[in-house]
Design a protein with these regions (language model features):
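Domain-scale recognition of functional cores that engage charged ligands
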Residues: 1-178
C-alpha cells in the first residue's frame, strides 16, 4: 500500500524532473505541473542521491463509511504531525501503563531511532554523518515538530543562519562564529 505509493510518487517526481514522459504522453497536463506553486524548475536535471526525491512522506489516511482506509492526501514537501503522536503516546503510556499492550496497539517508540538511521544513511559520510533538523525558526507552525524530533534523535536543531558552506561542504557555526 503506502510503500508502493511512495515508490510511485518518487517515480513521478523523477520523470517530471527529467524526461517528462508522463507529460509528453498527456497522462497529466503539463500546464498543471508547470504552474504548480511547489514545482521547482531549477531541480530539472538534478541527480538526487540514490535517485530518491523524498524519503519521508506524510500520507493522511481516512476511513470511509464502509470502514475502508483511503489516502486523503500525500505531503511530500514538509510532512508533519508525527511528533504530536509520539508525544501523546509517551504521555498516555506514563499515565496509563500497559493499556496499549493490552489492546494490541503497536509501539511507536522506535520511530526516531529509525528516522535518524535513515537520515544518516543518506549521507556520503555514513555512518559518521552529522544529522541536524533544519527549521525556519520558532515562529513556524511546525516548530514543535522540529524541536521534538531533534531532541528525540539527539541532534542539533538549526536555522539557515546557523549553517555555512566551506569548500563545497555544509558546516554548522560554532559559538565562535565558524
Amino acid at each position: 500500500g503506502l510503500k508502493q505509493r511512495v515508490t510511485a510518487l518518487n517515480a513521478f517526481l523523477s520523470d517530471v524532473y527529467s524526461e517528462g514522459q508522463i507529460l509528453k504522453d498527456h497522462v497529466i497536463p503539463a500546464e498543471l505541473v508547470y504552474t504548480a506553486s511547489n514545482f521547482q524548475r531549477e531541480v530539472h536535471g538534478v541527480k538526487v542521491p540514490l535517485g530518491v526525491y523524498t524519503h519521508i512522506v506524510g500520507s493522511d489516511l481516512i476511513r470511509d463509511d464502509q470502514g475502508q482506509y483511503m489516502v486523503l492526501e500525500d505531503n511530500l514537501r514538509s510532512p508533519s504531525g508525527v511528533s504530536y503522536l509520539l508525544a501523546n503516546r509517551q504521555a498516555m503510556t506514563r499515565i496509563y501503563p500497559g493499556v496499549f499492550d493490552r489492546q494490541g496497539v503497536r509501539t511507536v517508540g522506535h520511530y526516531t531511532t529509525q528516522l535518524l538511521a535513515l537520515l544518516s544513511s543518506l549521507s556520503p559520510r555514513a555512518p559518521q554523518a552529522t544529522v541536524v533538523v533544519l527549521t525556519p525558526g520558532m515562529y513556524n507552525s511546525a516548530y514543535f515538530e522540529h524541536a521534538f524530533l531533534a531532541q528525540q534523535m539527539g541532534v542539533e536543531l538549526v536555522e539557515g543562519r546557523d549553517l555555512f558552506v566551506d569548500n563545497g561542504r555544509v558546516c554548522m557555526r560554532t559559538t565562535s562564529g565558524r
